[in-house]
């Protein structure tokens, strides 16, 4: 009897969220343009990120808005991730992965994303994209009622598992560096 090994459905990885951040470093007109751009790219209303402390050399005060970010989940996250990966040529450095299954990479100019055009009124912005991968059942540790501990073997997503997930689902090539 040849037994076929089945994969436990609770061990399969899934895309939890994609977080897109544009750090401007100052409040004002440029921050408003970044807000408008991020809203056009994602179709979701961004939130302002706030400076944690004062840095006099950069002219940043604690509590001042210095950037914008958006968190995408579900289908919107997958669609946006496909567009953004096309901008980087479906290649991600191995050093972009951490030991918890998170991946981060940057885009130098937003005009590299397919389907976007240069608008002289907005200008050009770079952005950071962070991908978070989890296993099913992780909500048990985060919910308000009846929280429960999740063992480390199920909680953590290894670097290799995250690389394999992106290779299979998004045709990503991992580049050493």
From Swiss-Prot:
Entry keyword annotation includes Thylakoid: no
UniProt entry tagged with the keyword tRNA processing: no
This protein's GO CC annotations: ribonucleoprotein complex; ribosome
Coiled-coil segments: none
Any GO molecular function: tRNA binding
Keywords per UniProt: Ribonucleoprotein, Ribosomal protein, RNA-binding, rRNA-binding, tRNA-binding
GO biological process: translation
Highest taxon above the source species: Archaea
Function description: This is one of the proteins that bind and probably mediate the attachment of the 5S RNA into the large ribosomal subunit, where it forms part of the central protuberance. In the 70S ribosome it contacts protein S13 of the 30S subunit (bridge B1b), connecting the 2 subunits; this bridge is implicated in subunit movement. May contact the P site tRNA; the 5S rRNA and some of its associated proteins might help stabilize positioning of ribosome-bound tRNAs.
Entry similarity comment: Belongs to the universal ribosomal protein uL5 family.
PANTHER family assigned to the protein according to its UniProt record, in alphabetical order: 60S RIBOSOMAL PROTEIN L11-RELATED
Subunit organization: Part of the 50S ribosomal subunit; contacts the 5S rRNA and probably tRNA. Forms a bridge to the 30S subunit in the 70S ribosome.
Protein name: Large ribosomal subunit protein uL5
């Amino acid at each position: 009897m040849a037994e076929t090994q089945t994969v436990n459905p609770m061990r399969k990885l899934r895309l939890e969220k994609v977080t897109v951040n544009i750090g401007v470093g100052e409040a004002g007109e440029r921050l408003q343009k970044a807000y408008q751009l991020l809203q056009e790219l994602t179709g979701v209303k961004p939130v302002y990120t706030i400076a944690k402390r004062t840095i006099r050399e950069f002219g940043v005060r604690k509590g001042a808005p210095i950037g914008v970010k958006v968190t995408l989940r579900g289908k919107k996250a997958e669609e946006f991730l496909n567009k953004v990966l096309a901008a980087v040529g479906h290649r991600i450095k191995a050093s972009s992965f951490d030991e918890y299954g998170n991946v981060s990479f940057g885009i130098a100019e937003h005009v590299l994303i397919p389907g976007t055009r240069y608008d002289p009124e907005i200008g050009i912005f770079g952005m950071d994209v962070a991908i978070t991968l989890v296993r099913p059942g992780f909500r048990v540790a985060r919910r308000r009622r009846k929280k429960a501990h999740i063992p480390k073997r199920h909680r953590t997503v290894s670097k290799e598992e995250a690389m394999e997930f992106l290779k299979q689902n998004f045709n990503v090539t991992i580049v050493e560096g």
